[in-house]
Amino acid sequence: MFLRSVQLHDFRNYAEADLELTSPKTILVGDNAQGKSNLLEAVQLLATGRSTRALRDRELIARGKEQARVAATVERLGDTVELEMILRAGKRRTVRVGGETRRTQVEALGYLHCVSFSSLDLDLVRGAPETRRDWLDGILLQLEPVYTNVLAQFVQALHQRNALLRSTELSPDALAEQLPCWDDLLVRAATPVMRRRHRLIERLAPLARRWHGSISGGRETFAVRYQPQISFEQEDAQSVQQALQELLKEKRTLEGRRGTSLVGPHRDEVDLSIDEIPARQFGSQGQQRTLVLALKLAELELLEQVTGEVPLLLLDDVLAELDLHRQDQLLGAIQERVQTIVTTTHLSLFDSQWLQSATVLTIEKGRIGSPPAPA
């Protein structure tokens, strides 16, 4: 797979931009807040259907504009595919593949795969559980585009059940009478989310452990574990549903007092440990960076295994966060086989060999320019 071009119109701070990609390595250099991350965000939007930096499409549209356009040309499996997404404030998106409008966003996923690694990804270790859940979901959206619908159904069921729990118009008896129906809906929607996350961790964990051993020299043992509220000794749907139903009954009184659902995949945790010690609490900054790097390289490898294509790698100002050893491990893993787009504020972070084999472009105030003159 190779990303040949990216076009932006009224996206973030880009009025109009056309990026042609001819090299396996592209370095975007510029000061902070010039638009480097915005360009990578647009690529990730086409790959996953969502932004990790914006809650609403309105935030992605240039100030004073009503809509934005993101498009790309991708070469994959011997074919060239044109992808396009139109964003409108407060309205549904329009997605096109090969010039044909698709009925749903799901139908436009699966043509472009990418792994994004930014300084914000250090929150995978030290951040809230939601950060780790979002990371899992982002991978699943690329491995199984239908997961978009699976996740949306759960979110809808969760919001509806929470609205019922918060209702001030229902008596305790009326609430107790209606909850079992909403319990069933929540459980049926939650089960496929939890089973997919569990299977993903089962496949990802050994890859991450191997990468971590390579980076750390085998001095530490890294473990990634899925920690839902229920036991996953039996992973079949019926067992998961039964366990969720039993836990809902246990939490019913507490849920009524708090007015929110306390059972489901929105409460899942992903445990990251080094030598059986929680990395979030006790890992040094260097250990945490090694851990995140191992997770990202494992993600890259898993996407290639499942899709049969090497995904695009987006590195957003992350090299400055890594020491020389970890930089070498990352850049060595990439080499020529992984198409990579890197953003940076300084070219001094790259060795001369890497620079010679890369296309260097400048980003300034939402404009893409020619390579800077050598010093």
Curated annotation (Swiss-Prot):
GO MF, one example: single-stranded DNA binding
Example GO BP: SOS response
Family indicated by similarity: Belongs to the RecF family.
Pfam families in alphabetical order: SMC_N
Keywords annotated in UniProt: ATP-binding, Cytoplasm, DNA damage, DNA repair, DNA replication, DNA-binding, Nucleotide-binding, SOS response
Function (record text): The RecF protein is involved in DNA metabolism; it is required for DNA replication and normal SOS inducibility. RecF binds preferentially to single-stranded, linear DNA. It also seems to bind ATP.
Organism domain of life: Bacteria
Protein name: DNA replication and repair protein RecF
Organism: Gloeobacter violaceus (strain ATCC 29082 / PCC 7421)
Gene Ontology CC terms, in alphabetical order: cytoplasm
Main localization, broad class: cytoplasm
Lineage: Bacteria, Bacillati, Cyanobacteriota, Cyanophyceae, Gloeobacterales
Residues given in the record as ATP binding sites: G30, D31, N32, A33, Q34, G35, K36, S37
InterPro entries the UniProt entry points to: DNA-binding_RecF, DNA-binding_RecF_CS, P-loop_NTPase, RecF/RecN/SMC_N, RecF_2
Cellular location(s): Cytoplasm
